[in-house]
Amino acid sequence: MTSRIAVTSAPILPVLAKRWSPRSLDASYEISDQDLLSIVEAGRWAPSAMNVQPWRFSVAKRGSELFGKIASHLGGFNASWSPKSSAYVVVSAFTNGDSGQPGTTSQFDSGISAGHILIQAEALGLHGHVMGGIDHVALHTELGYPENLAVLVVIAIGKGAPAELLEGGAYDREVAMRSRLPLDEIVLHGLPNA
């Protein structure tokens, strides 16, 4: 499997530097219930404004009926590679709080929760790949969610496989150098000097 450790401008935790989102996944790997529980438990312990915890998860292991239903609502390229993943985690968020007013931080908090899921998967020697290319409305209906629970993303969880298993452009994307915008482009004010 391709090593994808980030080249950073300042030291970061090794688990963060190693985290990446492969598309080449081992279709024979079966995730344990304990690892999957650990992954969603990490999501549960994300910080949350006023401790509202607006996130909700639907979890499906490959081979289950729910996994197939989720896969049927993935769009384009995601539909070609992600069914090889060991599990899907649908991350959703309530759009209003107890007050009945729109929750201004619910999607933000749920994004942090998704980040926790990704980092826990990486710590377990697995990978998570966030997919926004989904039919949100159809998946919402399929899952029987209430109107005020919005589907945000689906995360494919699995064990990495050699990039050579991918073809064409997918292979090229898998082995390309990882990059991020430099800090001086994303820190608008107060970037510390190194």
Where are these regions (language model features)?
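Acidic, surface-exposed loops and disordered segments
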Residues: 1-194
